[in-house]
C-alpha cells in the first residue's frame, strides 16, 4: 500500500458517514537536487525554468479523460463538447480506491534558478499560462504567490471555491 493510499482510506471512511466528497493531493519530495512527486485530482505541479512553464503532472478530471477518447476517435467532438461536467474529478482522495495516481519515482533533476509551483485548480484553472509566467517571474517565492492571489481575486469569478499556491525556489 502506498503512502497516498494509506492516507486515502481514513478520508474515505470519514466521508462515507457524511456526504460524498474528497480532496485533491499534490506533494513533492526534493532530495539531492532531484524532485519526486505524487498527485491525485486536479491540482497542478509546474516547473518554471529559464522563463518557461511546464506542467509536470496529469490532472484527473473528466475533460482530460474525454479528450483522450476524442484523440483515439472513440467519441466525436460533439460528444466531447456536450459533456455537462468537464471539470468533474475522475480521481481524488476520499474514494474507496484510487482510480488514478500520477507520480514520478525517477526524480527530475533540478537546476539553480528553477521554481516549482504547487497549486489548486483555483489558480491553474483561473490564470492563463501568460499570467502564470508573469507571476512566477517575480523576485521571491512570496512575491510570486502574492501576484497569483491578486490576479485570481481580480477576476472575481462567481464559483471561485479555492485558491492555494506554494512556490519553491531552487538555489
What would you call each of these model-derived segments?
Residues 4-171:
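PP2C/PPM-type serine/threonine phosphatase catalytic domain
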Amino acid at each position: 500500500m502506498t503512502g497516498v493510499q494509506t492516507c486515502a482510506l481514513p478520508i474515505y471512511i470519514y466521508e462515507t458517514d457524511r456526504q460524498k466528497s474528497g480532496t485533491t493531493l499534490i506533494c513533492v519530495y526534493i532530495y539531492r537536487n532531484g524532485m519526486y512527486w505524487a498527485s491525485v485530482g486536479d491540482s497542478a505541479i509546474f516547473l518554471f525554468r529559464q522563463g518557461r512553464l511546464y506542467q509536470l503532472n496529469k490532472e484527473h478530471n473528466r475533460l482530460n479523460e474525454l479528450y483522450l477518447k476524442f484523440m483515439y476517435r472513440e467519441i466525436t467532438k460533439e460528444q466531447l463538447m456536450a459533456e455537462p461536467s468537464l471539470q468533474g474529478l475522475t480521481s481524488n482522495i476520499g474514494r474507496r480506491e484510487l482510480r488514478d495516481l500520477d507520480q514520478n519515482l525517477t526524480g527530475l533533476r533540478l537546476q539553480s534558478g528553477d521554481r516549482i509551483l504547487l497549486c489548486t485548480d483555483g489558480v491553474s484553472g483561473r490564470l492563463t499560462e501568460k499570467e502564470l509566467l508573469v507571476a512566477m517571474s517575480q523576485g521571491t517565492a512570496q512575491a510570486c504567490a502574492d501576484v497569483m492571489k491578486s490576479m485570481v481575486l481580480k477576476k472575481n469569478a462567481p464559483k471561485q471555491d479555492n485558491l492555494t499556491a506554494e512556490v519553491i525556489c531552487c538555489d
